[in-house]
Amino acid sequence: MRKKIVVGNWKMNNGVAASEQLAADLLAALGSSFTGCDVGIAPTFLSLTTAGKVIAGSTIQLVAQNCHYENDGAYTGEVSAAMLKGAGCSSVIIGHSERRQFFGETNATVNLRVKKALAEGLDVILCVGETLAERESGVTGDIVSAQVREGLVGVSDISNVVIAYEPVWAIGTGKTATSAQAEEVHLMIRTLVTELYGEPAAQALRIQYGGSVKPSNAVELFAMPNIDGGLIGGASLNAADFVAIVQAAAGK
């Protein structure tokens, strides 16, 4: 039985004070030893240490939104995996659709980041997903398969990898893939991972859904056999909504 995982991706929202308050609100609502599912929050780089101090010693994990694939150097505006580890992060989101869309990340550069993060001892949330045009063209399977295959090149052990399926057309649009649509892609991903890494690894792999998950649809989505939690955007900025989604994942 895979333990569900819910991560709040705060994106470029909340300053330091607001991040501290939201982290405190979540801690107060969930408690310091919540074990119903794995829970993480991903503040901006600027707020990582502040939010991290609030949740230190609790079961809420500190997650980064991105990392660079080099250790250090002349990469203005970037942050290395080792720096994130040193700041208290346990995981990092890599390959989010917004990184691919707005910052030119490719499957190849995503793969470099994945390997560097794993080498530095961070767990990885690898994001994959198709655009509306790709879905309507019937190439969802091809796109997502390529993102998984190429994102994991050279990775022999995926025990510290979570895959997040985020249909780009359902992010921040109010549109949500039906539970059946999401489950179809999640099953396809698990089948592909079985081919690449074998049945035990594929069955252990957790696959999150990330596309306008809300308290109103979380229970139905999380009831699907291959949906193992959520990567939550907008709803994670509201403590009550995020807690409701976490409770849905925990079956409460």
From Swiss-Prot:
Q: Which domain of life is it from?
A: Bacteria
Localization annotation: Cytoplasm
Q: Name a biological process GO annotation.
A: glyceraldehyde-3-phosphate biosynthetic process
**Gene Ontology CC:** cytosol
Membrane-crossing residue ranges in chain numbering:
none
Q: Which GO terms describe its molecular function?
A: triose-phosphate isomerase activity
Instruction: Tell me which Pfam families the record gives.
Output: TIM
Q: Which proteins does it associate with, and in what oligomeric form?
A: Homodimer.
- HAMAP family found in the cross-reference section: TIM_B
Q: State what this protein does.
A: Involved in the gluconeogenesis. Catalyzes stereospecifically the conversion of dihydroxyacetone phosphate (DHAP) to D-glyceraldehyde-3-phosphate (G3P).
What is the protein's given name?
Triosephosphate isomerase
Q: Species name for this entry?
A: Chlorobium chlorochromatii (strain CaD3)
